[in-house]
Amino acid sequence: MAIYGIGTDLAQVSRIAAVLERTGGRFAEKVLGPDELRVFHARRARSEARGIAFLATRFSAKEAFSKAIGLGMHWPMTWRALQTLNRPSGEPYVVASGELAAWLDARGITARVTVSDERDYAVTFVVAEAPDDVAAARSGAAS
């Protein structure tokens, strides 16, 4: 396996909160996958600030992932097709669905993700990995 791409994103939590308020909550439904949406609602019910921070980290994760795989937010990379979930240990991991999952599987691409947030910002870093020949072809190093 070799690095296919890396991506990072920094989201301003207050900006995410403003968009959420302006859209009457529809922003969360547009951006979050079904499992993420359940966690968002549960966290927001306990603490508005923690719910918004969760949304900011997941928005940031989708942006960083889209950069790592080199697609940006273009098909098959869609907001809801990628979810960042947490293992019982707290470790984040990504789960793709639908056409994005098929696109990743066809290339053997996997990813590692880390997310963090403080009061004002959420940050994500993603490393996408692929078989050596796939990564080399993307970088232009293939013969």
Swiss-Prot record:
Matches recorded under NCBIfam families: acpS (TIGR00516), pantethn_trn (TIGR00556)
Identification of the protein by name: Holo-[acyl-carrier-protein] synthase
Transport in keyword set: no
Reaction(s) the record says it catalyses: apo-[ACP] + CoA = holo-[ACP] + adenosine 3',5'-bisphosphate + H(+)
Cofactor dependency: Mg(2+)
A Pfam family the protein falls into: ACPS
Binding positions for Mg(2+) per the UniProt entry: 9, 63
Protein family membership: Belongs to the P-Pant transferase superfamily. AcpS family.
Organism from which the protein derives: Burkholderia mallei (strain ATCC 23344)
GO cellular component: cytoplasm
